[in-house]
Each structure stands twice: as C-alpha cells, then as structure tokens.
C-alpha cells in the first residue's frame, strides 16, 4: 500500500522509467557502453544509394501520422531505418492497470526491449553492453535481471553476388528501370543462418507495400 510504504521504498516503475529514458541521449544515440564500437561505417556509395530511394521525410510523416520525426543525428530517415542500429521498447508492464484506482506500490516492473543489429554487431556483445549499462545506472534500492529471450545475427547482402546481379538484370529488363537497393530493418533470422552455416547468399526482393501493415492484426499481401 502506498500509504504505508510510499516514500520509504523505491518504486520499481519509476526506476524502470528512469533507466529506459537514459538508454538514449539528446542526439538520439544509444547509450549502452560500447554499443557503436563495432558498427560498420556507411561508405559514400552506400549513402548515395540511400539518397536515391523514393522515401523522404514527408513520406515517413504521412505513413506514421506522427507530428515530427526523431532519430540519430547525422543520418537520414532511410539510413536510420535501414543501416543504423536501434534500441526499441516493445512494451512496459508494472503495477495496477485495470479499471479504477488502487493506491499500491508495484512489486515489479518489466520492459521488453529489442535491438536492431547491423554489420558487424554481435548479439552476445550487445547483451553484455546491456548488463553493463544496468550495473552502471540501476540504483542499489532495487534488484534487476536481464533476460535474453531470442536473438539472431545481422545479415547484409553482397551486391557483387552473382545472384544479386542476375536479379538486378532481370528486374531492369522487365520493368525498364534500374532497381533500388534498399536495406530493411526487419529481421529474417534464416538469412544469417544460411550465410554462416551453408555459406550461401540470399537474394531478398521486396514485394510488399507500406500499406501491408506488417505485424498488425490485419496484415495482408496484395496478389
């Protein structure tokens, strides 16, 4: 009961909120220690390819309905979503969230977090960075735990791969225009597994539309 213990014990929900807020700085960069150390730098040609993409800030605003865009300084929205790592809070849970009011102190607080990894980041290293962040920032007034629910390594296509070149030629022949090379932040764990275990490259071709509502209850694909 908050009337009995409020002000004497640290509220887990408030602690979690403070920790989550600290995971990004004012420039949109992730503050986990060493998070960017192994991130592969975009080449001038790669940035030029991103600049060719039809997606601009106006299209992101229209698709999402947000009042303004946000992200890591120094990169375009296309680069942020396709080539830069992210840390996203997927969900928060704590205390009483049902109808009416209850003046209680929550015993626990939980955040589900996902990280988009890019070349050459490794999931095992990012977990260590998260634990180090918690060690450096979590107060001694609470107990905490980091659970690794699932992970997969990064995957990036080699544009000089014969399969990619063949697909490029076929698409240009059919559509009469040079195809765009676009990096996608969505994960397909099997791609990295095929690269690492079988030594084969995958050719990924986007057939979906922004209106397909990926991961939504009404996700669909036009045929």
Language-model segment annotations:
Residues 20, 130, 134:
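Hydrophobic "lid"/C-terminal helical patch
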Residues 31-108, 116-129, 137, 141-223:
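An extended, acidic, His-containing surface patch that forms the Zn2+-binding/catalytic region
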Residues 113:
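Active-site helix-to-loop segments that bind/position phosphate- or nucleotide-bearing substrates
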Residues 13:
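Glycine-rich phosphate-binding loop plus the immediately following alpha-helix
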Residues 16:
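Non-catalytic, usually N-terminal nucleic-acid engagement modules in DNA/RNA processing proteins
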Residues 1-10:
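Histidine/acidic-residue-rich, glycine-tolerant segments that coordinate divalent metal ions
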């Amino acid at each position: 009961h908050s009337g009995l213990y409020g002000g004497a014990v640290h509220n887990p929900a408030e602690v979690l909120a403070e920790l989550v807020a600290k995971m990004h700085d004012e420039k949109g960069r992730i503050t986990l220690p060493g998070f960017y150390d192994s991130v592969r730098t975009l080449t001038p040609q790669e940035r030029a390819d991103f600049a060719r993409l039809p997606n601009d800030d106006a299209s992101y605003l229209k698709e999402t309905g947000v009042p303004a865009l946000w992200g890591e300084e120094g990169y375009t929205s296309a680069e942020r979503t396709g080539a830069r790592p992210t840390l996203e809070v997927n969900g928060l849970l704590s205390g009483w969230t049902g109808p009416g009011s209850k003046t209680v102190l929550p015993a626990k607080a939980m955040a589900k977090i996902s990280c988009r990894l890019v070349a050459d980041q490794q999931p095992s290293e990012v977990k260590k960075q998260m634990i180090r962040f918690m060690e450096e920032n979590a107060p001694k007034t609470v107990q905490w735990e980091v659970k690794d629910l699932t992970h997969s390594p990064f995957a990036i296509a080699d544009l000089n791969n014969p399969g990619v070149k063949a697909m490029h030629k076929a698409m240009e022949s059919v559509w009469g225009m040079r195809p765009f090379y676009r990096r996608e932040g969505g994960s397909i764990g099997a791609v990295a597994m095929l690269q690492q275990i079988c030594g084969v490259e995958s050719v990924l071709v986007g057939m979906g539309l922004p209106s397909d509502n990926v991961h939504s209850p009404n996700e669909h694909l036009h045929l």
